[in-house]
Amino acid sequence: MSKEPDRLFAQPLPQVPDFAFNEDVVRVFPDMIKRSVPGYPTIVENLGVLAAQFAQPHSVLYDLGSSLGAVTQALRRHVRTDGCRVIAVDNSAAMVERCREYLNGQDSMFQELLPVEVIEGDILALQFAPASVVALNFTLQFIAPDERLALLSRIRQSLLPGGALILSEKLRFNDPEEHALLTDLHIAFKRANGYSELEIAQKRSAIENVMKPDSLEEHRERLLAAGFSTVVPWFQCLNFASLIALP
């Protein structure tokens, strides 16, 4: 996977465009997400561990919004249940191309990995097969808020009894002081990882119109409304969290 440093917002831009998962972002994405999302490596690796507890024989494991395939590869490494396969879906052609290259390289390094299919497509239009695990890793926040419940309802309908949805998202907070504190701490995290004030400000301008975070309470209420019976937060670092939702 590319190790090119993220310098996309290092120089002043006359007009900051909306953030998009284009070739420029794909090229630096591993560095960008590691330096921007506290706890990201822990979430990815443990998502595979958690999935292994819910995977059922001869079922599908979905990675929705798969980007470069980090979660897909964690699923393939940790799940050993007979007959499982992974379907990774992303709507960015650049991401899908690099994801396929990365996973093909992993196939040559590891034996007995789960089979995987990488699809370029819109997860809102996806026809789900019966699934035991669905991963939505920092994906829902980029979907229009009024389309989130319908997607989660369809995921719930596709889940086999005993399956699980694992949902990771950036959070907003209803309490203004709590929101301000965790926002400031997140900025401090990015500074500590080498981002300048200019980079932080321009990235914020680029992403604020395309990423709409929810509060933990909103996530819980929406998941219950979608038909899930149990919602358990299993990880949080600053304003980033991951939940397990059970049917």
Swiss-Prot record:
Which family is this protein grouped under?
Answer: Belongs to the class I-like SAM-binding methyltransferase superfamily. Cx-SAM synthase family.
Q: Which GO terms describe its molecular function?
A: carboxyl- or carbamoyltransferase activity; S-adenosyl-L-methionine binding
Q: How does it assemble?
A: Homodimer.
Q: What does this protein do?
A: Catalyzes the conversion of S-adenosyl-L-methionine (SAM) to carboxy-S-adenosyl-L-methionine (Cx-SAM).
Underlying gene: cmoA
The record lists the catalysed reaction(s) as: prephenate + S-adenosyl-L-methionine = carboxy-S-adenosyl-L-methionine + 3-phenylpyruvate + H2O
Record's keyword terms, sorted: S-adenosyl-L-methionine, Transferase
What EC number(s) has UniProt assigned to this enzyme? Answer: 2.1.3.-
Cross-referenced SUPFAM superfamilies, in alphabetical order?
A: S-adenosyl-L-methionine-dependent methyltransferases (SSF53335)
Q: What is this protein called?
A: Carboxy-S-adenosyl-L-methionine synthase
Amino acids binding S-adenosyl-L-methionine: Y40, G65, S66, S67, D90, N91, D122, I123, N137, R204
Gene3D superfamilies from the entry? Vaccinia Virus protein VP39
What are the BP-aspect GO terms?
tRNA wobble uridine modification
